[in-house]
Amino acid sequence: MLNKSFAMYVYVQQFHRDMPPTPVFVYGQSLQTATFPGPTIVARYNVPLYVTWENHLPDAHILPWDPTVPTAIPKNGGVPTVVHLHGAAQAPDSDGHAFAWFTRDFAENGSTWTQKTYTYPNVQPAAGNIWYHDHALGLTRASLLAGLLAAYIVEWPELEMPFNLPSGEFDLHLVIADRKFNVDGTIFMDTVGAVPSVHPQWQPEYFGEVITVNGKAWPFQAVQRRRYRLRILNASNARYLNIRFSNGLPFTVIASDATYLSRPVTVSNLLLSPAEIFDVIVDFSLVVNPNATDIELLNSAPYPFPTGTPANATLDGKVMAFNVSAKWQVGDDMPMQEPENSTVVPEIGVPFAKVTALPPTMKTRYIVLYENMTSNDPNTAKTMNLYINGLRLEDPPTETPISGTTELWHVINLTPDNHPLHLHLAEFQAVQMLQLVDPDTFKSCMLKHNDTFACNLDQHAVGALQPVPEEEKTWKNVVKIPPAYVTSVVVAFRLVHNNMPYPFDATAAPGYVYHCHILDHEDNAMIRPLTLLP
């Protein structure tokens, strides 16, 4: 049993040597050690961690926020906050519920707040790549943009040691997030909304032209000519990343989000939605140039994804650079001895990663993603809000699965954007992506009736099948939902690696939520309650 205390502070951080220092919100065990991103917490499988979260934030937020979207607003000032361990299985009272917020010194708290110390059982399967971040109602986009996010690893030595993966200095976290800055170094966030008569400040997506990695703008990382493990997290508010190396160096994907694949998959590029993690092996010994050389990690995803503005080759099209050491030559000093398999990827994998069959009695649900626009003209229409099944977070729960069961959700995207769907507690994976035929007619009917059967979904869900990428065929905590598609996902309300029930009461109050992880969408109001039943 381990006990830790972490707090949130306001601090100043240098994102680039040519920029003024930037005020940020940070996590840390003290102000002196706090950073953006926050400290990476390393836990052990099946060893509980007890964390007391403290709020030492100032009286006012450092970024603008919009009180016209559902928001935690304390009566006596202060910045509300609550921590969600994203991708973990924990009891509802430790999940970071949106209404479980609290202000500095616990002076005020939300309606579902009950305790200062959270219990993290650490029972989800390896590879254990998860992260923690703020989750206060209506403030996720502002508070994560301000800096309240960090990586969390659950190690499982008995499972992972035979894989002989790169470790220590050869195991790197890359926490990627886009930002926009004012000339004085402060983070820029719009103060005027897309439809100010409805929401004075809220914008449907935040995009910054500066790409930061581990708190630095366009950084450099020195690497040797050997294998590295890169745990890549897209911690951007809304930006998708389609990353590749400038010299074509491949990624060997071993895990996606918290779970290993059934076998490694080698790809030339990776598409990461916000909140998505890929765990990859990169072999820098494959770099052809024998001299010390730089290779760039590039991004080509348009924003919003998939049909928005192309990435700028000199700004958001660049992520970082890797400084690859010179190749060892006869007569040079002998390099550090490397393990014999340093350029070999083992055939690691876990047998429970892929869904192989769907039980015929599986409960089926239909989840519909809506975008409420100012008009029907695609050239002038502005987004006012977004909903799931036409409902708000405050509306009664309609997704009430039985704890320990598995369900099939058909997620129908009637918006022009790709949405990263995130479920708290549960793990899930896409098994089919089916294109809608004549989606405008179906959407028009759904906006009137909000009923998939009355609108003849079976006559529209007959288009092309898009294959689920091999690197995403495992149990995930974020699944990409493309526009004008029905994406079918298998959702497990149990521990997938051993088929056991949760070691806590997942049916307790205040329950869980599921939502789009484009933070601006989540805040207004693409989020719904998820209540498990006994």
Curated annotation (Swiss-Prot):
Its cofactor is Cu cation. Cu cation 1 binds at residues 84, 422. Keywords: Copper, Endoplasmic reticulum, Glycoprotein, Membrane, Metal-binding, Oxidoreductase, Signal. Residues 219-291 form the Plastocyanin-like domain. It holds the Pfam family Cu-oxidase_3. It is found in: Endoplasmic reticulum membrane. The keyword Membrane applies. PROSITE patterns: MULTICOPPER_OXIDASE2. It is a peripheral membrane protein. GO terms for cellular component: endoplasmic reticulum membrane. Expressed in roots and basal stems. Glycans are attached at residues 109, 234, 291, 312, 323, 341, 372, 450. Gene3D superfamilies: Cupredoxins - blue copper proteins. It is an enzyme of class 1 (oxidoreductase). Its EC number is 1.-.-.-. Cu cation 2 binds at residues 86, 133, 517. GO terms for molecular function: copper ion binding; oxidoreductase activity. GO terms for biological process: cellular response to phosphate starvation. InterPro entries: Cu-oxidase-like_N (IPR011707), Cu-oxidase_2nd (IPR001117), Cu-oxidase_C (IPR011706), Cu_oxidase_Cu_BS (IPR002355), Cupredoxin (IPR008972), LPR1/LPR2 (IPR052152). It comes from the Eukaryota. The keyword RNA-binding does not apply. Cu cation 3 binds at residues 135, 424, 515. Belongs to the multicopper oxidase family. Multicopper oxidase that may play a role in the maintenance of inorganic phosphate homeostasis. This is Multicopper oxidase LPR1 homolog 3.
